[in-house]
Amino acid sequence: HTDSSAASDVYKRQLFALSNIGRDKLSAIEFDLEKGAETKVLFEHKEVDLDSVHFSRKRKVVSDCLFTTWKSERVYFDEEAKGIYEYLESQLPDCNVVLESMNVDENKFTVRTYSDRSLGAYYYFDATTQQLSLLANVSPWLNESELAHTRPIKYLSRDGHTIHGYLTQPPGKEKNLPVVVNPHGGPWHRDVWGFNPEVQFLANRGY
């Protein structure tokens, strides 16, 4: 299996992709197009599949890999990409940060954020000046202070397997609450951390 977000370095005849051939999780690999074979594992996570591998066309390097534990995380191979994300995350705390698009010089970006209490916002970011400007709020009608936080939990099943999930509690209430279990589809699917209107409605009603 290879991922559709794979990138190639046509000058070196290499393909950077995700593969689970010979392993039970999607990992970032380097593939030699002339040999028709995988030549290197760039990164693999011991618990989860990788979501994507990203390539800088300007610098001709693999910049980072994205994966989801309880929330989206990255491992970096490129200091410039790492610096951009770390700066944005310092300016936009308590949310996931995504680079939606960029210019050819890879120094001007459209940035998307989201969290467990908001559908997020779009920003314009100029990396040369570190200017970050709000373009639009996706859900300006939501008052985050009135909404519930979602946090990760895990527990052991009867047969000894670790089950991961999320717990959302009404603000200011922690004990003796009625519980609604909201399972995801699948079995290949999983829930992710972010804004869920159904969950927020139930938390607002005291569940």
Regions found by a protein language model. Give the residues of each.
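Surface loop/turn motifs at the tips and blade-to-blade linkers of beta-strand repeat domains
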Residues: 42-46, 92
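Beta-strand C-termini and the immediately following turn/loop, strongest in propeller blades
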Residues: 13-23, 43, 63-70, 76, ...
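Single conserved hydrophobic/aromatic residue that forms the stacking wall/gate
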Residues: 1-7, 11
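Alpha-helical "lid/cap" subdomains adjacent to substrate-binding clefts that gate access
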Residues: 58-98
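Hydrophobic beta-strand positions in blades of beta-propellers and related beta-sheet-rich domains
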Residues: 15, 28-30, 62, 74-75, ...
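Short loop/turn segments that connect beta-strands within beta-propeller blades
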Residues: 32-36, 127-128
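Serine-hydrolase catalytic core recognition
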Residues: 98-207
